[in-house]
Amino acid sequence: MENTIGENDTLSAIVAAAVHADLLILLSDIDGLYDGDPHRDPTAKLIPVVPSIDAHILALGGGSGSGLGTGGMATKLKAAQIVTEVGCQMVIANGSKPALLYDIVGGKPVGTRFLAKEK
């Protein structure tokens, strides 16, 4: 079976929801969710915390024809929707910095943290 871009993001969210995980970490080629495309816009700012996922946040992932999305961010946001709905937090962080995993698990501000809805 051939994987398509984004399949792993969705699959990991489904598994995290099924096992009632407290935290899902998705690693990417950028530090997290930005208010613009950091590959094209040097003034794009990292969004450290997303309390809830709304149309504005989804548009940052490339939805609604915004053109701001960076490779697979839309699927990461879909994964965030899945897990936050069931009470699991999610973090998007830079996968080229594996030592950050300790900081993420320790609750330090790394990447973009999506807050879980109350169960």
Predicted regions and their residues:
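C-terminal catalytic "cap/lid" subdomain
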Residues: 1-119
